């Protein structure tokens, strides 16, 4: 019986050690295999020395999925949003890759070209790259102001004498002080609105400077032929510098760095093999006693670990940094702190769901004094809770009739919740997305829009620290019994000191349709509190759209109508011809509707410097209609569909990001 047990134990020991040996060898082969595959560069067409993020058949693990190359044309080409780009050069020592558009490299007058953009996380634009914008089929008559920025493009005659093509060589967001647009940017918007389309191409700043000093179609072709520079991803450069090979994991869908195993010495391998068999023999002889000793050792270690952990939990001097941060949070925020058990009791075990926000589910609850409250329970996957801390800190500093009141919070490890006042009427979207909007008159809608403006004005200008919301939309505007609006959900709010209002975002945040253009493209400038102004303008136009839903049904199916309500301008043109925005309303209501429309349109100007600040928006809403001018029709660059689809999920599931408040505002 003893011999049988010993033999069984010996057999199990052999199997276990052999399994460890096989697993180790397979892991080494896998790591070495990817490094061997991806470490050497490859040739595609006339280009040598290509590496990540580019790849060809047989090297899928070595490149990003968006950057597969086609080598059949003799030059390496890749397709992005149906636009082909060719590689002009790749210098991984300097970290610069040069590309050019294949469709207009020889002819900038192609009628079907359109704007596309790169995944700048993988290949960011180099600092030497700027944007060249070409406007097609525009009015011939150009003002003297506009002519200082745009030059005529000599394309084959299309048969019309009053239409021309033009190009713009500089990024208007970063003009020198001597060329400030001041109040004349609407002239450029009017010019862009007169064109049938415009296409933005990255280009070398040196070539654009030459084109600007010596305008000609030949120099324009040279600027397109020279292409534009992109930088190798910083993660990849770090990987290459550390003797690794850049690649992409199909399993985790993220960048990986493959490293090779150290070369083995043959003599050393023989010694290791002998030791391997000796260890097997020794373990086989003493397996029973070793097994018993192993069990005792494991039990002893586990017991020590458990006792040590209990001591750590009970000793305040041994608490983790997370516990310290949470204690500091509770001490700094002057709000009632609830335990998770109390939250469960308040919500009656989370019985009634009243909504789902970007970071969790909202439940109805009742405090011990009988007051109804809304309890927002965050998802347990929210990392270290930075967004939660941000929300509680920002909301605890606010006190305004148009800002939702925070009553308390819960923070126990990954269990986090906020408790705020309950609104019987729910959120604004339930009114403007249903037949309820037709029962609300223009005075009520105006009161809601004005209240939201006052709330945002308070966040931007009335707090000790400027609070930027970044997710203004109907779902985040709550209505009390008197239909007075209250701005809620500060889960996306970012705080800056009053004189440091320019924000830098690592992730796009917000809700598609309400996101300002500068969040998508640096062409429009930097992200700041003016992004909230844009979202507010879209909110106001959304309210007007709900009131005029029947007149817009023919446009709502269009994707572009999500981003700009063209029907608003058509109705304004009708108003100039004697027709009001909506029939069967009084003159007073007609004036209110027009005022809301004009304010909304001013707020959604594509250039942040053309949008009014929220304190000015309140003045416009409270002022006379006669003092408001019709703003120019915005001309937005085309936003690739893929970008929009990715961004539409950001407000629902987003990682923490870093805010840099680095530019002082006088």
UniProtKB/Swiss-Prot annotation:
User: Would you indicate the residue range of the signal peptide?
Assistant: 1-30
Q: Which reaction does it catalyse?
A: L-seryl-[protein] + ATP = O-phospho-L-seryl-[protein] + ADP + H(+); L-threonyl-[protein] + ATP = O-phospho-L-threonyl-[protein] + ADP + H(+)
Task: Give me the residues that bind ATP, please.
Answer: 354-362, 376
Record-listed E.C. numbers: 2.7.11.1
**Sugar-bearing residues?**
119, 141, 171, 198
- In this chain, where does the modification Phosphothreonine occur? 508, 511
- Sequence intervals crossing the membrane: 276-296
Entry keywords, A to Z? ATP-binding, Glycoprotein, Kinase, Membrane, Nucleotide-binding, Phosphoprotein, Receptor, Serine/threonine-protein kinase, Signal, Transferase, Transmembrane, Transmembrane helix
Q: Look at the named UniProt entry and state the broad enzyme category this protein falls under.
A: transferase
Phosphotyrosine modifications at: 420
Q: Where are the Extracellular topological domains?
A: 31-275
Q: Which residues lie on this side of the membrane: Cytoplasmic?
A: 297-666
Membrane-topology annotation of the record: Single-pass type I membrane protein
User: Does the record bear Transferase in its keywords?
Assistant: yes
* Domain Protein kinase: from-to ranges: 348-636
Gene Ontology molecular function: any one: polysaccharide binding
UniProt record similarity statement: Belongs to the protein kinase superfamily. Ser/Thr protein kinase family.
User: Any idea what this protein is called?
Assistant: LEAF RUST 10 DISEASE-RESISTANCE LOCUS RECEPTOR-LIKE PROTEIN KINASE-like 2.5
